[in-house]
Amino acid sequence: MQHLAVFGGTFDPIHWGHLLIAEAALQQIPIEKVIWVPSLNPPHKKASAFRHRLAMLQLATQDNPAFTVSSVEKNRSGVSYAINTLTDLSVCFPNTHWYWIVGLDTFQTLPRWYRGQELAPMCDWLIAPRLVGGENIAQSELICKQVKQQLRKQSDTIHWHLLHIPLVGVSSSLIRKLYRIGKSIRYLVPEDVRSYIAAHKLYSEDSE
């Protein structure tokens, strides 16, 4: 049985923080590959065109053989939901033990996800703690235990692992804001991604 991790998200744009999280998962958990899955129509978010986000992911991950980018959501209609993505990937990759990489803030909302109670036991959860808000590892672990307890009340089981990652205070929203006001995003994203953003005028008033 192979062990694969899904890293789903908007990735608008992908940045070094995302890459550090994925690399930490590879180093700390016995998984063979990280499958990056950009959301086509993420719930509660307005994102750049899918083709741009997919292209930036491919540029950022092309030098790591343990990273692969999936366009599984490309032809899906409606809102992108995690359980549909995992179901589709399971068809493409049978006989797989699945992991799902997620940030702590997002993991906290898992009990309220679309069919979240059904999704929770389908994979192990690899959680990137949010340290920029002042939380420490102990507080992050407590939050994870609270989520597990909520799901247990609904007769669901869940397995989670807290990833140990360096503190990187960068977010996609910050990068978009900086670029929009003409500030440098060098060293916040891979250079190929920065060049792509400039070439396609993403995050500016006259973006494609």
Swiss-Prot record:
Keywords: ATP-binding, NAD, Nucleotide-binding, Nucleotidyltransferase, Pyridine nucleotide biosynthesis, Transferase. Pathway: Cofactor biosynthesis; NAD(+) biosynthesis; deamido-NAD(+) from nicotinate D-ribonucleotide: step 1/1. Catalyzes the reversible adenylation of nicotinate mononucleotide (NaMN) to nicotinic acid adenine dinucleotide (NaAD). Its EC number is 2.7.7.18. Pfam families: CTP_transf_like (PF01467). This is Probable nicotinate-nucleotide adenylyltransferase. It comes from Nostoc sp. (strain PCC 7120 / SAG 25.82 / UTEX 2576). The keyword Transferase applies. Disulfide bonds: none annotated. GO terms for biological process: NAD biosynthetic process. HAMAP family: NaMN_adenylyltr.
